[in-house]
Amino acid sequence: MALSRGLPRELAEAVSGGRVLVVGAGGIGCELLKNLVLTGFSHIDLIDLDTIDVSNLNRQFLFQKKHVGRSKAQVAKESVLQFHPQANIEAHHDSIMNPDYNVEFFRQFILVMNALDNRAARNHVNRMCLAADVPLIESGTAGYLGQVTTIKKGVTECYECHPKPTQRTFPGCTIRNTPSEPIHCIVWAKYLFNQLFGEEDADQEVSPDRADPEAAWEPTEAEARARASNEDGDIKRISTKEWAKSTGYDPVKLFTKLFKDDIRYLLTMDKLWRKRKPPVPLDWAEVQSQGEANADQQNEPQLGLKDQQVLDVKSYASLFSKSIETLRVHLAEKGDGAELIWDKDDPPAMDFVTSAANLRMHIFSMNMKSRFDIKSMAGNIIPAIATTNAVIAGLIVLEGLKILSGKIDQCRTIFLNKQPNPRKKLLVPCALDPPNTNCYVCASKPEVTVRLNVHKVTVLTLQDKIVKEKFAMVAPDVQIEDGKGTILISSEEGETEANNPKKLSDFGIRNGSRLQADDFLQDYTLLINILHSEDLGKDVEFEVVGDSPEKVGPKQAEDAAKSIANGSDDGAQPSTSTAQEQDDVLIVDSDEEGPSNSTDCSGDDKARKRKLEENEAASTKKCRLEQMEDPDDVIALD
């Protein structure tokens, strides 16, 4: 029975008669949809691009095994109608970033609720709600942590009012030449999967990087080693996949190439090993014989679940061989020109990455990892907890009822913590912050300054990495404010493609130039001021003035290393947006984007609302709230 009967009359009418939008039908989305219909919401639109996977079933309770492979949105609708058969639910198996879902679409709703798992889609929905002037409730969970906040144009800060932590990245030379952490080997193994079975990407090369600036070697010795490495085929002359095909995907030849010959070649780069422990090549025959010598030890029973056991080198070599054979068969079944896509839930693909990563860890003297640990790191999986999703979904509805009651001033940003804070609160409410006057999204006249080298940055970089990736536009049009309205980038396919390889300076862009970027879909215009600089750091293509540089600094890298599983957003193949392009970096993905880890809140440190850290020590700072009685939706633990 719907709870709306117990609500005040005006609120009950808004609940039963108003139309709301739920974006995402995953962990939070399933709980939220159930809560909405039980509260009495009768007109709900639900959108999600994902299909149901077996791994979803432990927490996304609207789905059953028989639903695997079907649309999440459609099945969620069918399941939740059993709670409220009279509800009018419209399911959309689509991306929220589809141009069909324009500003007019968003204006149909009295409230939008996000249950997303990636930053790109969050940014987009944030802008659409600002353009349509519709309240948005944003949410996220990560393990035991959760967060809910309200966004209203002109009243509160928007999702993009403050820079998000820069995603952790790894230089290509570290991945290929000098891995020092298990995650480096896991990234290398994922790259190797794509090089052998998937879509090849030059930025995901796995062979030794001869251009590494740290490397130095004797040319004659290197040439001799290179000859030995190339006896089975030079992967620099032909693609890795073509070379592997020419060997018939022979596991022993692949093993020898990757774990012996390439490692021997790395050893010729003597400068790399002056302050590092050098890697130790693996020989297939020796690995097999060592395994026989240790047979008695191998037969000893291991404690724990199979996926949580760390095997020996011989076992991983065998797993490597078996997984290659299985993947070779799968690739052949798909036909010529086919590609496989790495999926953490595909056993052969996971076997391949587990074995390859562990063999490389052993070579570089690291402790090997269990399949469970590697799966968590490879997919950046924070174990999802159903009760966390349930708590956050409940809070979303409570905040929604405040909005529909016309009491948005009573809305709060609410943090769910793993442990109670010093005031014994597990749920901590913080006052909503006003809009950031310098925000390049919700300010009255959005404007930003970008520092770059106009003689090096191309139009394609401006389009893909700055306008689309950094400023989250979907279909941008960019013109130069030069009095002539020169079109630099057009959203019409092919119209300005010839401009892509040209440098910005080729169009007269210099220090002080101004670009106007428009996204018709998002009803969003951004003025970009160009600040020319030739003093940018190594590998830094651009910086947003007042923002963090587009590179992981030492402190950021240190923080990320502490919480590699928690720093993700838009790099996955999200449920509501397209997959992002990958450079020579680790792109990590998570089930639900992580919320802030905040046991208290401070107005001076707004970044706490976005950043998730592992250290959950309670802060002594007071919440920026007036002294008041505990709200009803705050749990006090005595």
UniProtKB/Swiss-Prot annotation:
Keyword list, A-Z: Acetylation, ATP-binding, Cytoplasm, Isopeptide bond, Metal-binding, Nucleotide-binding, Nucleus, Phosphoprotein, Transferase, Ubl conjugation, Ubl conjugation pathway, Zinc
Pathway(s) per entry: Protein modification; protein sumoylation
GO cellular component: cytoplasm; nucleolus; nucleoplasm; SUMO activating enzyme complex
Phosphoserine: residues carrying this PTM: 207, 505, 548, 590
Pfam families linked: ThiF, UAE_UbL, UBA2_C
Location of the region described as Disordered in the Swiss-Prot/TrEMBL record: 202-233, 548-638
Name of the featured protein: SUMO-activating enzyme subunit 2
